[in-house]
From Swiss-Prot:
It holds the Pfam family SfsA_N. InterPro entries: cNMP-bd_CS, cNMP-bd_dom, SfsA, SfsA_C, SfsA_N. This is Sugar fermentation stimulation protein homolog. The gene is sfsA. It comes from Geobacter sulfurreducens (strain ATCC 51573 / DSM 12127 / PCA). PANTHER family: SUGAR FERMENTATION STIMULATION PROTEIN A. NCBIfam families: sfsA. It comes from the Bacteria.
């Protein structure tokens, strides 16, 4: 996936109210950017960090800039949670995600469960329901999800277990949008309920996949599969 051009480099001043970030651009201008990430962004919102912003030409937008990348522990991290669904779809279509090949159709945002929309539904033959999660927290060499308590994420795991019980395929897909982290594991210290449900889901037949993304100011793309440490 090619990122918007041009991107504007700067330095993070602060992130606040979840969806706002003040950034000093390289020319000295201070702007407020939209932060497209509702998590805690632990490890990715340190004041003074190098960042890249995209700029919208939509005059109706309240905030013209969107925060896209941050330098975290020497690696560019993609913090835009709107991108992973597109990355996974692109990875399926170009053959990178071998585990999800062989389906005739890919449909986004299909209703299922209780007032939910699955990120991707793969159809023909059979059906595969795919929930995609963005991972940017890395500690001790392991990528961790979630970075904040997520009742929505817990609900998705329950719904994936139900589609598997009904005979369909269910997949929880972790996209690690940074270059470090050799595996993915549930962040039990942050959301122990999510960790318990992930392990329960895997035992029930939900497939847990994780891929690392190459993240640069020019592009983001899935590159390699990582193990998911979801055992007891």
């Amino acid at each position: 996936m090619i990122l918007p051009r041009p991107l504007y480099s700067g330095t993070l001043i602060r992130r606040y109210q979840r969806f706002l970030a003040d950034v000093r651009l390289d020319d000295g201008t201070v702007v407020t950017a939209h932060c497209p990430n509702s998590g805690s962004m632990k490890g990715c919102c340190q004041p003074g960090s190098a960042v890249f912003l995209s700029l919208s030409d939509n005059p109706k937008r309240r905030l013209a800039y969107t925060w896209e990348l941050v330098m975290a522990d020497g690696y560019w991290a993609g913090i835009n949670t709107g991108l992973p669904n597109r990355l996974v779809r692109e990875g399926i279509e170009n053959g990178t995600v071998a585990e999800l090949l062989g389906y005739e159709r890919i449909r986004p945002e299909v209703r299922y469960g209780t007032n939910s929309r699955v990120d991707l539904l793969l159809e023909g033959p059979g059906r595969c329901w795919v929930e995609v999660k963005n991972v940017t927290l890395v500690e001790g060499g392991t990528a961790l999800f979630p970075d904040a308590v997520t009742e929505r994420g817990q609900k998705h795991l329950r719904e994936l277990m139900e589609v598997v019980r009904q005979g369909d395929r269910g997949v929880i897909f972790f996209v690690v949008q940074r270059g470090d982290g050799s595996a993915v594991a549930p962040a039990d210290a942050i959301d122990p309920v999510y960790g318990r449900l992930l392990r329960q889901a895997v035992t029930a037949g939900v497939e847990a996949l994780a891929y690392r993304a190459l993240v640069t100011p020019e592009e983001i793309r899935l590159t390699e599969r990582l193990p998911v440490l979801a055992g007891e």
